[in-house]
Regions:
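P-loop/Walker-type NTP enzyme "switch/lid" segment
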Residues: 2-17, 32-83, 89-94
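Gly/Ala-rich phosphate-binding loop of Rossmann-like dinucleotide-binding domains
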Residues: 23, 27-28, 97
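Hydrophobic anchor at the start of a short beta-strand
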Residues: 31-33, 84, 103, 127-128
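Inter-motif core of Ras-like GTPase G domains
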Residues: 90-111
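Short, acidic/turn-prone active-site loops that include or flank metal/cofactor-
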Residues: 107-114, 162-165
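Conserved C-terminal guanine-recognition region of P-loop GTPase G domains, centered on the G4
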Residues: 115-126
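Beta-strand-loop-alpha "switch" segments that mediate conformational coupling across diverse proteins
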Residues: 139-190
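NTP-binding/hydrolysis catalytic cores, primarily Walker-type P-loop NTPases
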Residues: 171-217
């Protein structure tokens, strides 16, 4: 009997490094993963090399034991996958957003981004805020208080650490397409562990054991 896949949506600032590394973790945990890029400028698409014989805008691309597409995932056999990760960018007009099990909103403390999120008409599902932290201080409470005071409904606010090394990794992903877990910085790895264990209910020991394979995976 086929099982409905878990749909996880990502909204807001660039987060294709998180999406790709999370997908790679899921693959290491024995899960079949489909990644869909619904963002306006196809920011995640640049990370996936397409064979000459395939059109990344219309064809399903198989890369690094994961499937990737740039268009409507519903035209494929969804039941084949355990998880479907969707990058929406800032576009929340996509109907599929209402089918997501979780939504992760990626923002920083810039006021225009925070205010934009307040005006989003999001479905009544589990929403998590990932705060991009470009500083050596914990700004999570600032963001949390802002959204609470403005009656924005979310389950939890996590720090999404972003160092110079993380920014370098993002550029390298687009140019060299090297999705290797040993390249993940420790703070980002900790965030991925939190998502897998706390939100997706994977066994903690199993998740932490993946670090043994970082040099080859």
């Amino acid at each position: 009997m086929s099982t409905k896949p878990h749909l996880i949506g990502f909204i807001g600032l660039d987060s294709y490094d998180l999406i790709l590394f999370l997908a790679k973790y899921l693959e290491n945990l024995g899960q079949s993963v489909l990644i869909a890029d619904y963002s306006k400028f196809g920011r995640l698409s640049y990370c996936i090399p397409a064979p000459v014989s395939l059109n990344p805008k219309t064809d399903l691309i198989r890369y690094n034991n994961m499937d990737f597409l740039r268009h409507d995932y519903e035209s494929f056999q969804r039941e084949e996958y355990n998880y479907i990760l969707i990058d929406f960018g800032w576009d929340i007009s996509q109907e599929v957003i209402h089918s997501c099990d979780f939504l992760y909103i990626i923002t920083d403390l810039q006021q225009q981004n925070m205010e934009h999120i307040l005006h989003m008409n999001l479905p009544n599902i589990s929403v998590y805020i990932l705060l991009k932290n470009f500083f050596h201080i914990n700004n999570r409470n600032n963001a949390k208080d802002y959204f609470v005071e403005n009656h924005f409904n979310f389950k939890k606010c996590y720090l999404f650490p972003t160092s110079v090394k993380d920014l370098e990794n993002m550029v390298m992903l687009q140019y060299y397409h090297d999705i290797k877990l040993h390249k993940v910085t420790k703070p980002l790895r900790n965030l991925i562990h939190t998502i897998l264990i706390d939100n997706l209910d994977f066994d903690e020991k199993e998740v932490l054991s993946i670090k043994r394979f970082h040099k080859t995976k």
